[in-house]
């Protein structure tokens, strides 16, 4: 029996993973896991606290600004050996090639940010933080990005964590289907009801080719393949399945919220109980002492100014609740919130602006790497890099062949690479300060070689000086130029002296 996409969907789904994701979303952003198959506005069950939503929104916004900063390309096309050889064969200046690559990078980045795609990427980051999983699709024709939660897709991975199968399930009204899909269904003998709904399955499978791996796609409705099929090199596949943290051997990732679910559970439970206790404490009961002549019915039915039996102390108000107990609970909640604030980078170290500086991006990247560990590095590999390849393929068809063979490769510029560049510059500054302090020693002791001392200091600070030192040919050319300048200066001096001598002789003859 042939395995259909619907059968594969049921096989690859993991109900326990989906249920855990729903619980994690409930304590933070419940709408992330709303069932898209409901066909209407889904019912969202909210928690008794909103701190989780605040923390996730804050962390997602920071990561989005750091990973995809507006106005700054998040990747840079590498000047590979293949590109250098091509430039040499065409006798093209390498600086012109570098400038052209930079223009391509900017154009690709600008295209990514069209049609509110940054908002969708922020949504993807929220899904990763809360559930650990997300599926996004880059539509190159429309220049848009679409994202789905675990409710809409299933995935299978191999032992190394590479995805092998992706099955996306979407529900459409029959009347909203593409005409091409309708024609394919009619040819297969399937009748569509105008008011009914159908499930559209999209299956993306990783396959091995003779030269490289590729992704193959087809659509299916009711066991019938519909529409056009697709095929891309695996690194140019527009379907991307990033994870927040993927354990070896697992098909689905784990989110940041799961690491702190204990604190979120305590925050939720105490917030609920404290809220109910505070409401109860607002109620006031009147205690009536009938031994002192007071009658409950008399006080219950009395109007203002009525005369009733009793004494001044026969009735007293009683308020429920204990202030000290509520203060202790609030203090415990505050301790939980402080821990979560630190874990979710809740602080005001970056301006809330449309454009941020490169230094602010670097600071956020450093804080994220220190707080989130290797997860931040993982996002560059399974989210940024695939998007960079796809966006570059949209800019210029001439780049496509180079992208397919990976002769044209994008290098991620934000995140950890920004930290590495900053660390390299800081090492150079530190080494320069040490050299400036030790340089006078070479003047005091003629036995000391200043270049050798500088080489030792550069090496101690792990500074690669090969990219700064002049080549032997450059040094020889400069020496030759200096000799020519010296010869010209000598000739000019001799000419000046001869002219002065002639003038002196002429004056003496007068």
From Swiss-Prot:
Gene Ontology, cellular component aspect: viral capsid
Q: Which UniProt keywords are present, listed alphabetically? A: Capsid protein, Viral capsid assembly, Viral genome ejection through host cell envelope, Viral genome packaging, Viral penetration into host cytoplasm, Viral release from host cell, Viral short tail ejection system, Virion, Virus entry into host cell
Q: Which domain of life is it from?
A: Viruses
One Pfam family matching this protein: Head-tail_con
Cite the InterPro entries for this sequence: Connector_podovirus
**GTP-binding as UniProt keyword:** no
Cell compartment(s), UniProt: Virion
Could you give a single Gene Ontology term from the biological process aspect? symbiont genome ejection through host cell envelope, short tail mechanism
* Major location category of this protein: virion
- The cysteines joined by S-S bonds are none
Q: Which family does it belong to?
A: Belongs to the podoviridae head-to-tail connector protein family.
Report the function annotation for this chain.
Forms the portal vertex of the capsid. This portal plays critical roles in head assembly, genome packaging, neck/tail attachment, and genome ejection. The portal protein multimerizes as a single ring-shaped homododecamer arranged around a central channel.
Q: How does it assemble?
A: Homododecamer.
Annotated protein name in UniProt: Portal protein
Gene that this polypeptide is encoded by: gp30
């Amino acid at each position: 029996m042939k395995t259909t996409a619907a059968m594969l969907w049921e096989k690859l789904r993991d109900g326990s993973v989906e249920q855990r994701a729903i619980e994690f979303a409930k304590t933070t952003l419940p709408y992330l896991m709303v069932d898209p198959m409901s066909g209407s506005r889904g019912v969202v069950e909210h928690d008794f606290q909103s701190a989780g939503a605040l923390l996730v929104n804050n962390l997602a916004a920071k990561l989005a600004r750091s990973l995809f900063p507006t106005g700054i390309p998040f990747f840079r096309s590498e000047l590979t050996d293949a590109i250098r050889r091509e430039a040499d064969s065409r006798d093209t200046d390498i600086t012109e090639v570098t400038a052209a690559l930079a223009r391509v990078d900017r154009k690709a980045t600008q295209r990514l940010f069209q049609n509110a795609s940054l908002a969708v990427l922020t949504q993807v980051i929220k899904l990763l933080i809360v559930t650990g999983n997300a599926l996004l699709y880059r539509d190159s024709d429309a220049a848009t990005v679409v994202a789905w939660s675990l409710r809409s897709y299933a995935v299978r991975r191999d032992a190394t964590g590479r995805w092998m199968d992706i099955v996306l399930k979407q529900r459409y009204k029959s009347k909203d289907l593409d005409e091409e899909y309708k024609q394919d269904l009619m040819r297969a003998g399937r009748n569509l009801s105008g008011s009914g709904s159908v499930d559209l399955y999209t299956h993306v499978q990783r396959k091995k080719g003779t030269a490289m791996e590729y992704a193959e796609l087809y659509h299916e409705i009711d066991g019938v393949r519909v529409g056009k099929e697709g095929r891309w090199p695996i690194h140019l596949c527009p379907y991307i399945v990033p994870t927040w943290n993927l354990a070896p051997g697992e098909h689905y990732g784990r989110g940041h919220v799961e690491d702190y679910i204990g604190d979120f559970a305590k925050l939720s439970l105490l917030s609920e109980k404290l809220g109910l206790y505070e409401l109860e404490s607002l109620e006031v009961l009147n205690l009536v002492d009938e031994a002192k002549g007071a009658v409950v019915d008399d006080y219950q039915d009395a109007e203002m100014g009525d005369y009733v039996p009793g004494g001044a102390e026969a009735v007293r108000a009683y308020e429920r609740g204990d202030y000290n107990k509520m203060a202790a609970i609030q203090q415990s909640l505050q301790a939980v919130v402080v821990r979560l604030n630190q874990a979710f980078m809740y602080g005001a170290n970056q301006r809330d602006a449309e454009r941020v500086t490169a230094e602010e991006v670097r600071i956020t990247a450093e804080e994220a790497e220190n707080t989130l560990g290797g997860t931040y590095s993982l996002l560059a590999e399974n989210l940024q890099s695939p998007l960079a390849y796809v966006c570059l393929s949209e800019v210029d068809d001439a780049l496509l062949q180079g992208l397919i063979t990976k002769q044209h490769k994008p290098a991620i510029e934000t995140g950890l690479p920004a930290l590495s560049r900053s660390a390299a510059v800081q090492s150079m500054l530190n080494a320069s300060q040490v050299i400036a302090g030790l340089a006078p020693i070479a003047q005091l002791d003629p036995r000391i070689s200043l270049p050798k001392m500088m080489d030792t200091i550069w090496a101690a600070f792990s500074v690669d000086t090969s990219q700064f030192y002049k080549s032997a040919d450059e040094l020889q050319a400069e020496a030759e130029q200096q000799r020519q300048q010296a010869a010209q200066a000598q000739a000019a001096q001799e000419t000046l002296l001869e002219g002065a001598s002639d003038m002196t002789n002429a004056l003496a003859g007068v």
